[in-house]
């Protein structure tokens, strides 16, 4: 279930705390601002999460080559926001693999094409698996299955170039690595 709206989501007034949704909601993923690149005003199609048939993505950062990716792989995508290329590129490689590639390999293939900065949460909506990755941007996770760009007590910084997967809705495990093209050097 995806709920996307301008302003605050109130779990009570939006009836999300109603027990009838418990069977459908395994976790909540949120993004609290409109995109900062091409579209500053909140619109449904240009706000997080961005979706394709099999993927849902929230992203913090700035992709510098999204127009080139769009032209080469997904020229039908006309969304002006850089983030929109990520789920569509994941979908492109998912369809190319025809169920022969594990999701973490599709993610690796996608991330190695991206230039710029990103902190990503990706959901494979075909099986509800959740993945994290980052390049340049900050992303923290903890041993309870949570993640945040803000961090806090008990949170660890996700290393660049690592893909984590949420196992059993309670812990993050490393499932792959990718070659980064980070514009920043952290020592």
Regions found by a protein language model. Name each.
Residues 1-187:
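N-terminal segments that mediate ammonia production and transfer
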